[in-house]
């Protein structure tokens, strides 16, 4: 896809992100954690999220709001939803279960939207080919990048994330990717992290790394955090220079130290 078209898709997706009323969503969904069971395959929202929000070819620049997305997801799955409700929520109202699933899928959607912004930003700014599919995502790989003759897996890693490394190692053994790169991001501002670093007694180095990461991120007016062009450019340069020697899991702190430039 031509860079100009990739830029248009990126801008359209950022316009969608800017319109999200995050404050209202958080107020509505944050206290609701009533549907925490593993969802059966028939209720997996990943295919729908990719269908509605991942449009790398730019065939359409329309992204539905969350309510429209959820309504369509719900209507397509009435039969498996009935089975799920009978199994786990016998005697509960549909309204109770629906609200719980709304909250569950909203949290999933925010994470996926963050992944997609990274991918759209990459396509608009970088030369190395990026691929993302819901099938890969279901296995713990948010995207994969072709660098030389190496296929590098990507995991977008929020600051508070903890368990992805073990999942990533299993994926590497199973799929034989050359390496798995953790791409860290934080919801905190550089100023907040700098204050924590100054007060820290045992974790100052980690906070300094997150300060460095935060300088490559941008907060939209509604609070949604997105990736700056400098972030993906630094990662691409790192992969071009090191792809042939990378193997196994490349953890977030190594990426922050060696791939990202300082503020």
From Swiss-Prot:
Enzyme kind, highest EC tier: hydrolase
Ranges that cross the membrane: none
Encoding gene per record: tthHB8IR
InterPro entries: Restrct_endonuc_II_TaqI
The species this protein was found in: Thermus thermophilus (strain ATCC 27634 / DSM 579 / HB8)
Protein name: Type II restriction enzyme TthHB8I
Biological processes per GO annotation: DNA restriction-modification system
EC number in record: 3.1.21.4
Cross-referenced Pfam families: RE_TaqI
Keywords noted in UniProt: Endonuclease, Hydrolase, Nuclease, Restriction system
Origin: domain of life: Bacteria
